[in-house]
Design a protein with these regions (language model features):
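Short, aliphatic-rich beta-strand segments
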Residues: 2-5, 57-63
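Post-HEXXH active-site segment of zinc metalloproteases
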Residues: 70, 86-117
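Hydrophobic or amphipathic, alpha-helical segments that drive membrane association/targeting
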Residues: 1-8, 34-44
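Active-site recognition of the HExxH zinc-binding catalytic motif
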Residues: 74-86
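Long, well-structured alpha-helical subdomains associated
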Residues: 115, 122-139
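Short alpha-helical functional segments enriched in proximate histidine and acidic residues
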Residues: 26, 83, 87, 121, ...
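Zn2+-dependent metallopeptidase catalytic core
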Residues: 11-32
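Catalytic zinc-binding patch centered on the HExxH motif and its immediate surroundings
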Residues: 37-60, 69-70
Length: 139
């Protein structure tokens, strides 16, 4: 696993790396490269996080720089669910259409099944991470 993080402080970089490593272990993902960019994502895109797939082993996660520690952990967990979906072939972008678990969808929204999975699991994994490692040292 290789993680490259840009656009934030050493303290946040350390937290981002720790959450990604935790999620890689929890999701049993191996031989994955993740590039993380922290920026004014919400101002520009009205989103706190994005995950895009370069191929089944290379991913870009974009994170908004204004997220507090709790939100940052939850958002990384959410985006890592998408990494798992892409890496396992559950989620495939076909031009502007999306193939999820062999069903073709015309578009994506927060109510899409792959987003529902990510929203449901982000809380479970974030709570487990916080219960294991705490967040006080990162705030």
């Amino acid at each position: 696993m290789l993680v490259d993080i840009q656009g934030t402080s050493k303290k946040k970089t350390s937290l981002i790396r720790k959450v990604i490593e935790y999620m890689m272990n929890e999701l049993k993902l191996k031989n994955i490269f993740i590039d993380v960019e922290v920026s004014n994502l919400f101002v520009n895109e009205k989103a706190y996080g994005f995950c895009s797939c370069q191929n089944k082993t290379e991913f870009l996660i974009e994170l908004d720089q204004t997220l507090n520690v709790q939100e940052l952990i939850e958002t990384i967990c959410h985006e890592m669910i998408h990494v798992k979906q892409y890496a396992t072939g559950e989620l495939v972008e076909k031009g502007k259409k999306i193939l999820y678990k062999n069903c073709l969808y015309e578009s994506s929204s927060d109510s899409s099944p792959w987003e529902k999975e990510a929203y449901e699991k982000e809380i479970i994994f974030a709570d487990k991470f916080i219960n294991t490692f705490g967040i006080m040292q990162h705030s």
